[in-house]
Amino acid sequence: MKFDVIIIGAGSAGMQVATALQKAGRKTAVIGLGRSINEVEVRPYERKGGTLLIGDSVCEGLFEDGRLKAVRTANLGAYPLEAERFVLATGKFLGGGLVADMERVYEPLFGLDVAWDKDRSRWFDADFGAPQPFLRFGLETDAQSRPSLSGRTVENLYACGEILAGVSAVDGREAIAASAAKVLSILTEEGHAEA
């Protein structure tokens, strides 16, 4: 199955991008586990015919020449979902966008490069009410909101929302919305959407 844009993550940032692209006439799909679904944004998207794969998860990315060509999901198995562009909006730790173990912090879907402090003792502040440093971990992107894989930019993958380094819902929703708006603007400027 081929789409113009596949959005991975059905939270606020992912649904903001999906809804705007759908209104612009783009064929989109949203894949989300359902951990942080924004029901207010999902319902109109679904009513207008958006492809919504809730309860499914990406289990493999198929890369070729620095581009993500398709993804395989747990529920669709051998049937890849292809797109010209992909948007990653999976959140941080609670949404499953980042995972931490005793040695590292990593992005579990594609193994994208993550900005994090290697000194585990600096991951937190003992004052529970203080800003927690681990909430600043995430993907660093280029000026076009594209993350990197092993130091190389993935040309057609864009990241927005809490998955980004320095963005946290603790600070308010403005930064999340702004990152989604930036990705939408970039897709629009490239001629991949009309907003």
What does each model-found stretch correspond to?
Residues 1-195:
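Residues forming the flavin
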